[in-house]
Amino acid sequence: MVFSVSIFASLAPYLISAFLLFLLVEQLSYLFKKRNIPGPFFVPPIIGNAVALVRDPTSFWDKQSSTANISGLSANYLIGKFIVYIRDTELSHQIFSNVRPDAFHLIGHPFGKKLFGDHNLIYMFGEDHKSVRRQLAPNFTPKALSTYSALQQLVILRHLRQWEGSTSGGSRPVSLRQLVRELNLETSQTVFVGPYLDKEAKNRFRTDYNLFNLGSMALPIDLPGFAFGEARRAVKRLGETLGICAGKSKARMAAGEEPACLIDFWMQAIVAENPQPPHSGDEEIGGLLFDFLFAAQDASTSSLLWAVTLLDSEPEVLNRVREEVAKIWSPESNALITVDQLAEMKYTRSVAREVIRYRPPATMVPHVAAIDFPLTETYTIPKGTIVFPSVFDSSFQGFTEPDRFDPDRFSETRQEDQVFKRNFLAFGWGPHQCVGQRYALNHLVLFIAMFSSLLDFKRLRSDGCDEIVYCPTISPKDGCTVFLSRRVAKYPNFS
């Protein structure tokens, strides 16, 4: 024992020197990669500014944005990873337009490959990526979207009734964040895999998705008992569950039955091919379905919450929505909103698009540099850098009075969605642009139309209630706390 202590004592100066040398090299490496772009001159050793990010994501990213105000980009350091934040729209386009093996790789999350696994749609390139996107085309035809619309309305109505019933006649406020999340999770389950999840599987699914949500916001410590590790294992279980649904759907479609949900439209096309296309095994389909779920679930939760928030603060907009919907659809008809009626709700659709512009759910789209990439004449992004193009910042560039919530910017007269198309990046750009954006927009339009027509609502305002928080997509700080009451004599009966 004395001998061991003696050896340690003799080695201690060398160990301390080696550790200090490591810290020095780490700082010098950061400064070398940072070069002349804005960013902290010193970063905490090893973990960088990860603690600041996890403790208060909003302040962290706001600071990155303000630091990049003049140059269009800024630097930082997170758990051994050099990062570059991109505020300027044209610089962001350089990232989105160069997603390929020898430039940038979309990762979806700073530690996405650990969390999602390697076999994921967002990591595909070239023919593999094109093949899978072609497979997805039948999922978003007019016939498919019409099927989803009916399912969406049934789920939305059921949840709106439950929300109103839980408020004691409108005398008690409710926070909508968790309620909207539950609505969207049931919508995703119903639309994506319909009849293939029984009650027990749905409950397991809900538990695993909540574990994933918590882990996606945690430090990437992949050990038992840590949220990130639990999230990674939950993703695997979710993919397996969805893979089982894919197998059941294949059997049903092979028997010639009619599609009833998204996986049916997908599998109907696959079983018709001989031989079956690449990446069409049950397990791979399950992983791809999880990609859809991840893309749809939290993004829609964010958009629905901001829709309620913004409609409450803009009574004129709310009145115009109600007037338009009332001319097209009546709850007393007990009829679902048809796709033709949905297409007629042009102002309501403009409101939905403005909600997405004004508060894009996923504010950044992380990529990793596969090479040293010359971004500007004076700065080259080093290989291995995690790059964060900010679609949030782009939404406030170019547009007329961008800080103002103004749905009319998307009218047929002004057409700012075309004039400033390069700034509207909420659905991405380039080869990995969101394949389900029509579905997502329809979901938001249906929710706005039904929520505003069936319910009266008023925010319980508090200090900072409209501030942005990340969970993991953005939402109002107060969770959108509202008083709810029914504004119709009776709810429609869609049965």
UniProtKB/Swiss-Prot annotation:
Membrane topology: Single-pass membrane protein
Subcellular location: Membrane
GO molecular function: C-22 sterol desaturase (NADPH) activity; heme binding; iron ion binding; monooxygenase activity
Gene3D superfamilies named in the record: Cytochrome P450
Keyword terms, alphabetized: Heme, Iron, Lipid biosynthesis, Lipid metabolism, Membrane, Metal-binding, Monooxygenase, NADP, Oxidoreductase, Steroid biosynthesis, Steroid metabolism, Sterol biosynthesis, Sterol metabolism, Transmembrane, Transmembrane helix
Binding site for heme: 434
Entry's Gene Ontology BP terms: sterol biosynthetic process
Induction, per UniProt: By infection with Pseudomonas syringae.
Outcome of gene disruption: No visible phenotype under normal growth condition, but upon infection with P.syringae, no accumulation of stigmasterol and increased resistance to the pathogen.
UniProt-listed InterPro entries: Cyt_P450, Cyt_P450_CS, Cyt_P450_E_grp-I, Cyt_P450_sf
Similarity annotation: Belongs to the cytochrome P450 family.
Function comment: No activity with campesterol.
Other information: Plants overexpressing CYP710A1 show higher levels of stigmasterol and lower levels of beta-sitosterol than the wild-type.
Name of protein: Cytochrome P450 710A1
Organism encoding this protein: Arabidopsis thaliana
